[in-house]
A protein has these predicted regions:
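A structural preference for short, pocket-lining loop segments at secondary-structure junctions
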Residues: 48-54, 67-109, 119-137, 157-161
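A glycine-rich phosphate-binding loop feature that marks nucleotide/adenosyl-phosphate handling sites
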Residues: 3-9, 87-93, 135-145, 152-153
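A broadly conserved detector of short glycine/acidic/proline-rich loop/turn motifs that flank catalytic sites
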Residues: 57, 91, 185
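Short, histidine-centered active-site or binding-site loop motifs used for metal coordination
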Residues: 55-57, 166
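NAD(P)-dependent Rossmann-like dehydrogenase/reductase catalytic/cofactor-binding core
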Residues: 1-47
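Conserved catalytic cores of soluble enzyme domains
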Residues: 111-115, 123-197
């Protein structure tokens, strides 16, 4: 983790065999301390100055409460006690995206507020002074992918099904997905100094 530099994006794929059994055993033996939690997520101390931000909603959907605790984790990351933040969970899937019912409950204003909050969280992750690492697996859809793409580094499991699937229900990936996809397409060209148009 010390070698990771903020503001650079690295994608690593785990081996097809999944996580080695000795690593799982070591993780299960490692004591973790709960730092903060709410009904939507939790922050754990993994030791060595590393925090884990775990989603806890049904299907790990992105909710306002989840993002509130995510902002708290990013604030903690600014203190000297913490060196890195990992986003993952011990669930069947990483995240199926935004909780649309939660967002639509507030009408057009609620949808706009939920979208803005997700955008702000993604930008706060990108601006974090220390590494933010996403470890997606299985289903990582919509808002879950938007959060993943905002991380400084991505360590993806070999079994990863991902996409900006909002289009299927008539929604533009407005939580940062369009911007992050474009950034990935244009950025390599911009680094060479060429005009992408």
């Amino acid at each position: 983790i010390a070698d990771l530099r903020a503001r650079s994006v690295t994608v690593a794929i785990s081996p097809d065999s999944g996580i080695p059994e000795q690593v799982i055993e070591r993780l299960e033996e490692t004591p973790v301390a709960l730092v903060r939690e709410n009904d939507h997520a939790a922050i754990y101390d993994l030791g060595d100055g590393v925090m884990l931000f775990e989603f806890r909603t049904k299907q790990n959907t992105i909710t306002g409460g989840l993002l509130d605790l995510g902002f708290e984790a990013l604030k903690l990351l600014e203190t000297p006690d913490w060196k890195a933040l990992i986003l993952s969970n011990d669930s069947e899937r990483f995240s199926i995206g935004a909780n649309l019912a939660d967002a639509m409950a507030g009408g057009p204003e609620g949808i706009e507020a939920a979208t803005r909050k997700l955008q702000d969280f993604g930008m706060a992750m990108r601006a974090a002074p220390k590494p933010v690492i996403a470890a997606p697996f299985n289903m990582t859809l919509g808002g879950g992918l938007e959060i993943t793409m905002s991380a400084h580094a991505i360590v993806a499991h070999s079994e990863l099904y991902t996409g900006l699937v909002e289009v299927g229900v008539g929604i533009i990936p407005a939580g940062g997905g369009c911007k992050e996809m474009l950034r990935r397409l244009v950025n390599p060209v911009a680094r060479r100094g060429a005009d992408p148009h």
